[in-house]
Every structure is written in structure tokens, then in C-alpha cells.
Amino acid sequence: MKTPFSKMDGLGNQIIVADMRESTQALTPQAILALSADPEMHFDQIMAIRNPTKNEADFHIEIWNADGSKAKACGNGTRCVIAWLTDHNFGENFRLEAPTGIIEGKRQADNLISVDMGCPNFNAKEMPVSREIVDTNHIDITAGPLKDACLISIGNLHAIFFVENDVQHIPLEKYGPKLEHDPLFPERCNISIACITSKKSLNLRTWERGAGLTQACGSAACAGAVAAYRRSLTQRHIDVNLPGGKLNIFYREDDHIIMTGPIKYQFSGFLNPLTGCYKKDNS
């Protein structure tokens, strides 16, 4: 069984886009873990493109983390899907049926990819948390120097910790796993540290739920930008500098978050969704 795929790079976020429109076969845990363990195919997320189940959508996407768990959102992965669709002549503007609802995206004139990530959710009663939270702008959770987080859902849950010094000096590989698995988060959580560099920019590092330390996380960049604006630290339209590069985030007055940035192709080929075996297309 051959499934076309492209290995892509969304600012260092390693993404596999798999064209599963002609298949009813699900990706098996065996296949996902085999691909994740392969040095060349190792990924942060797999974005599986399927035919839509809703009339208002052009395509349906499933999202898988490297540990085999399902994800509800992946901003950089969605940008890679939009790029793949435009490069395969499906159009320029798309409505994608994602786990969190309909997501709109398009290719810009400058070849950057923009995605409307929808509206953030600050209501703790609608978040998978284990205790009552009165104010999601300031939650009582601590790990080492990290404290006083802002909790936001961008379809998936994010905790943003603001620090005064550069984000590279904090060992997120040490504190990230502890916070991801904190009892407050029964379904785990994405953990980011942010440092404000100006009213128009911030630096961000992320420990991603189910993927670990990543070069970039699009939904975390959105959460970081919104959290900074909520605390009156930045403007609505800012650059978020990640280890893998820069994303432009615009938190519009209608509450929608627009994320824009580049993507790169690495290689394409065919994979077996049952086993994870794959072959590059050298044509």
C-alpha cells in the first residue's frame, strides 16, 4: 500500500505531509513509531490529508505526534499542508477540516504561507485541567525559575512562562517534561518560555506535548503572542523568534490569530501506513 508523502520543514518543525485521500487505512501506531525512530524521517507531527466529511471544507486533516498520540492542532504542520496543496495545483485558498474545527489558509504573494488559527480560548472551564482556575492570565504552577504562567487554548493547551533573560539560558529540556505531565494537566500541556524583546517582538522556546523540545511550534507562537498582548507587554502584530526562525503573528481585533511564515521541502516519496516502511522518490 503506497501513500504519497513529503517531508517538510516549518522553521525547523519537522513535518510529514501524507496524502491519504484515496485510502481508508489509518496510520498504525507501529508505522508512526517506526517513522519517528528513523533518523531521516524523524518528525514532530504527521499531517494526514483526507477527503472532507463536511461540505464547508476542502480537505480533512488528521494530526499525529511523534509518540503516536493524536494532536488537536499544529500551526506549522497546517502551513505545510497549505503549501503542499498549492504546489500540487489544488488552488491557493483552502478551508481545512481540523480536529478543532475549520481552519483557513492561503499562500501569500511573497510565497509565505498564512493560516487563520481561529480564536484563543481563556475559559478554564473549557480546558482539560484538574482543578478550578480563577484567572488563566496568572496560574499558580512552578518548576525551577519558571512561575506565574498564562494558560491559553489554541485548540490545544499552552502554558506560557515569561522570563526576563534570554530563553536559551533556561534548561527547558529539564523543566518541560515535568510541567507537561503536571497533575494540573490530565491530558498534558505544551510548555513555552517567552522573553519580550520589544513591543513588536518576543523570543520563544517550546517543549511540545508529545514531541519534546522543538525548533518551532506554530500554535505555541500564537499562544505566546496572545499571552504577551493580554499582559500588555506587546502590540497585536508582532514577530515571534523561534530557534528555527521567525513567525509573524497578528492577533486581530476580531479575536482571530493569523500566523505567517515560510516552509521548505526536504524530500518526497511513498510510505506504507501499516508498517512505516518508505521509499524516496528520486525522479
From Swiss-Prot:
Pathway: Amino-acid biosynthesis; L-lysine biosynthesis via DAP pathway; DL-2,6-diaminopimelate from LL-2,6-diaminopimelate: step 1/1. It comes from the Bacteria. GO terms for molecular function: diaminopimelate epimerase activity. InterPro entries: DAP_epimerase_AS (IPR018510), DAP_epimerase_DapF (IPR001653). Substrate binds at residues 13, 45, 65, 75-76, 156, 190, 208-209, 218-219. Its main location: cytoplasm. Gene3D superfamilies: Diaminopimelate Epimerase, Chain A, domain 1. Its EC number is 5.1.1.7. It catalyses: (2S,6S)-2,6-diaminopimelate = meso-2,6-diaminopimelate. It is found in: Cytoplasm. Keywords: Amino-acid biosynthesis, Cytoplasm, Isomerase, Lysine biosynthesis. The record marks 158, 208 as: Could be important to modulate the pK values of the two catalytic cysteine residues. Pfam families: DAP_epimerase. The active site is at residues 74, 217. One of its GO terms (biological process) is lysine biosynthetic process via diaminopimelate. GO terms for cellular component: cytosol. Belongs to the diaminopimelate epimerase family. Homodimer. Catalyzes the stereoinversion of LL-2,6-diaminopimelate (L,L-DAP) to meso-diaminopimelate (meso-DAP), a precursor of L-lysine and an essential component of the bacterial peptidoglycan. This is Diaminopimelate epimerase. It comes from Bartonella tribocorum (strain CIP 105476 / IBS 506). The gene is dapF.
